[in-house]
Amino acid sequence: MLIVGKNDFKLAPVVQNDPNGGGLYFLNIVKRTYAIKDDIGSLEAIPEEEQPDIVGAKSYKDDYGRSQKYPGDSGACKQLIDVIINGCAFAPEGEAVEELDVTINIAGKHKTLRVFGNRHWERNEAGGVDISATQPFTTMPIRWEKAFGSLSNRWNPLGMGSEKDHETDPEDPLFSLPNVENPEDLLTQFGQKVRPVGFSAIPEAWEPRRSFFGTRSAYWSSFRAPLPPKDQDLRYLNAAPEDQQFGDLIGNEIIILTNMHERFSEMAIKLPDSKPRLFYVPRKRPVDLQDTELDLQDTELIETYLKLDTVVIDLNEKFLTLVWKGKLESQINVLDTFLYMYGVEDSCEPSKSIGEIQRKFEEEIVALEWAREMIDENPEKKINKVVSDVTDQIVKTLKELKADPALISLLASTATLDEKEKMLRAEFDNLKESLEKDLMKQKEKIRSWGNAPSTNFEETN
């Protein structure tokens, strides 16, 4: 399979099973990541070579716990768009507070969380239980570990507030309260149960996603898996909290975040108004999986619709990621018939016609064929291209070996292949001789230890 076109996106065509028994199909996953560049939330596309790959779900691994950091990029198309936000609450102007509200406002949806400093349940003089004084804070992570929950809580097994935590005094049966709560459903009484709240991704094994998966029966595991249960609710695919799921986001939407920036009480991030367009080419002649030949009879572009699937905003690491997905229907031969090309358009501009993109695509094919012919006709150019591809790694290794700086400069120059090869051989001979001398010195040193009056290593070393 050959991918032609813009590469500042990550593209992965993934073969999947149709859950309705329709056979295999291609799920096209397109991903683009932007850096959040400055204090007002402007975005800049990350360079092509630094674009993060399409990956599975990732979790935190730190002192707070192991909650999910990002959902996986693969998986079937969602009915609603996930918007997931990772970040912290910051006290305005850096002055410690006991509590504050953090809010997100996206496309008319407004969500507020109340963030508290550390608290715990404590016994009063009458033998009852009260909430302790709140410790002021300047920064508080907004994560599931800081929300209501416990190991036995199906909605948040990593949370706090309903079971004694491991750091509590063993003589004290009481425990910490959560730092992150719903301002409309606050904990006020000992033993009260509330729903965990947050902005982050919900793992598949937690509620409500677990119940949406469907019936896990012996029949399912024996006769239908790995296809999902027939009674699966497609809401299972969404990882964002329900109030962070959207029917449509076209770009240009502004996300306003309050008390989630270390210096400013309000931050606005405008979603990119550009989106990729993806096409496939049904070839007109039989091909095998190794075939990368192109000709102009193979350029009938057919567009596959891409829908925005997931938005991840990570304010801690300062990036925004968009993931689109599009499905090629199962009746298409997915194994050997496709050639992909994708480009980007601003949503505020008129879409280019298939004819315009077809002409551009044909120009790219002609350019590729010309480059292929040049390499085939000139083997030295092909060899030099290979050498160029590995030069960075060679230079890095030579620097570690403290090679001649002149050699390193030569490798980065436009010297001929013969000149580079000659100097490389000479330098490696020198390095080999130097290493052999060092080895002999070490052997002599070890022998001297055996002849020394004392056998104490520290004294003879």
Residue ranges, per PLM feature:
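Extended intrinsically disordered or low-complexity segments
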Residues: 2-380, 385, 392, 451, ...
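Intrinsically disordered/low-complexity terminal segments and short unstructured peptides
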Residues: 291, 396, 413-415, 454, ...
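Residue-level detector of alpha-helical secondary structure
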Residues: 365, 369-372, 376, 384-391, ...
